[in-house]
From Swiss-Prot:
Endoplasmic reticulum 2-OH acyl-CoA lyase involved in the cleavage (C1 removal) reaction in the fatty acid alpha-oxydation in a thiamine pyrophosphate (TPP)-dependent manner. Involved in the phytosphingosine degradation pathway. It comes from Bos taurus. Residues 470-550 are annotated as: Thiamine pyrophosphate binding. One of its GO terms (molecular function) is acetolactate synthase activity. It is found in: Endoplasmic reticulum membrane. This is 2-hydroxyacyl-CoA lyase 2. InterPro entries: DHS-like_NAD/FAD-binding_dom, THDP-binding, Thiamin_PyroP_enz_cen_dom, Thiamin_PyroP_enz_TPP-bd_dom, TPP-bd_CS, TPP_enz, TPP_enzyme_TPP-bd. The keyword Acetylation does not apply. Mg(2+) binds at residues 521, 547. The gene is ILVBL. Disulfide bonds: none annotated. Gene3D superfamilies: 3.40.50.970, TPP-binding domain. Keywords: Endoplasmic reticulum, Fatty acid metabolism, Lipid metabolism, Lyase, Magnesium, Membrane, Metal-binding, Thiamine pyrophosphate, Transmembrane, Transmembrane helix. Thiamine diphosphate binds at residue 98.
Amino acid sequence: METAVAAAPAWGFFSSFLLLAFGTLVAALLGAAHRLGLFYQLMHKVDTASTRHGGENVAAVLKAHGVRFLFTLVGGHISPLLVACEKLGIRVVDTRHEVTAVFAADAVARLTGTVGVAAVTAGPGLTNTVTAVKNAQIAQSPVLLLGGAASTLLQNRGALQAIDQIALFRPLCKFCASVRRVRDIIPTLRAAMAAAQSGTPGPVFVELPLDVLYPYFMVQKEMVPAKPPKGLMSRAVHWYLANSLANLFAGAWEPQPEGPLPLDIPQASPQQVQRCVEILSRAKKPLMLIGSQALLPPTSSDKLRVAVETLGIPCFLAGMARGLLGRNHPLHFRQNRRAALKKADVVVLAGAVCDFRLSYGRVLSRSSKIIVVNRDRKEMLINSDIFWKPQEAVQGDVGSFVVKLVEGLRGQMWASDWAEELRQADQQKEQAFREKALMPVAQHLNPVRVLQLVEDTLPDNSILVVDGGDFVGTAAYLVQPRGPLRWLDPGAFGTLGVGAGFALGAKLCRPDAEVWCLFGDGAFGYSLIEFDTFVRHKIPVMALIGNDAGWTQISREQVPSLGSNVACGLAYTDYHKAAQGLGAQGLLLSRENEDQVVKVLRDAQQWCQDGHPVVVNILIGRTDFRDGSIAM
């Protein structure tokens, strides 16, 4: 009796153990079945005879989203998608460095308001893009980066160029995904492109492994052994590989929606707009700072310009908003911004940010009422309650907000003496610039004078691409873009090397525009080889190099403060001859032909109009124009 009683708990324990083990086994089998897509394969078959490949799905989504250009540096991991894009009429433009491909996609995104797309190969191909992707993140550009990768089954097994690419790009991108099955290409890309444009725009990354892009017969050849297995373990491995292959391609070619998903764009509430209207209606000296976000869709640049003109508030323009009001508009002021901000009683930061560009908010007066509007809450409130405090903070689309302000302030007028005060200060500063242009320099040409002549020569249909430090910083004061979305600079990241990529994207987007690139000689070193790209693809752009044989923006502070010019010196290199060696046209400006600056610029224009990329190597001296210009 005791034995039977004692055996009961033991049997109960054993049966529980069996149930637990059985449940664990079932769960493991179900999990394996799910990972291998066994249930999905019951309803969706594999077309083993098809020669189609995943690159076709990639191209179809890009085409459905209106993508016209794909920038790349070729690699075996991504060949199928490049070929498929070409077949669908998407122009594939190959560069000499991957970073240029992403910069070009960035330019397309900024100028069109759509997603710019670049595709690069795995490993080093992707790591070469990191700077450009980070620049796009900080500049809030919707860029889609497509990256090749090792086959799904070979990742983490020592495959060629296989690294954890998702971990690398997750901090840089709004959306990161690795496609594991061909059928997932389309929905993943649609989600990525929507994410790039929703909220605060930014870059997104989609990883496309080899076996997802290549056709079934090629993947099968590499993945599943041709000889039938003999041993039990070999059969198990063969079964696993065969089902992995089937899962990759099951349902691959079934029709799916390919077009754009709805975007989520934040908007100011009517209550917020009304509070801002009331603040502005009481202003005596209002001022607007308009930044790049104001030019984002859905508000067109023309509609925004009309709204700003109707408001009648004096404004400063920055980033992509430069040129919004054209040249010499009575509401647009370019000089003495710091002094104007101190005097204004109401300041509207319309996409402008209180980072180093506004001295972290210290340029704002404590007595001013500050209205700040931005899609990104963190950026909107940066350094607030330290050096400045907003009266009204609006998280929403900037362009739409400005248009709504007009509706609430229709008929509002501000005293003309405020704008006149700002205009007089502008004119005094510009007179000082004219005087600096006449000052002699120790050697070569005065850069201030050269840039004034560039300003006088620049056509109305031009797009300005700027890439450099000292020379470009001087140009920002002297050269005016002729309209909105006609000034391309790196943005707040201050990246050198954007020039060739930005010029490439700009000329493709606006083939009827003249693309003028202003380079420092240091920055031009990054872009020189891409004149091979311009020549091969017949893309006529014009590069003006302010060649002062040095990293002058750094030198002008390093030498007086630290007593050494170490690492700041370059040479008066014959960049125009290097460009000629790549098949472009090259021209030289120096003191020997300083009376022909305009003629040489006109000659360069003519070369471009005839279809040739041109480099004008302008030997310049040094001035004190930008002493004390380094931001900390």
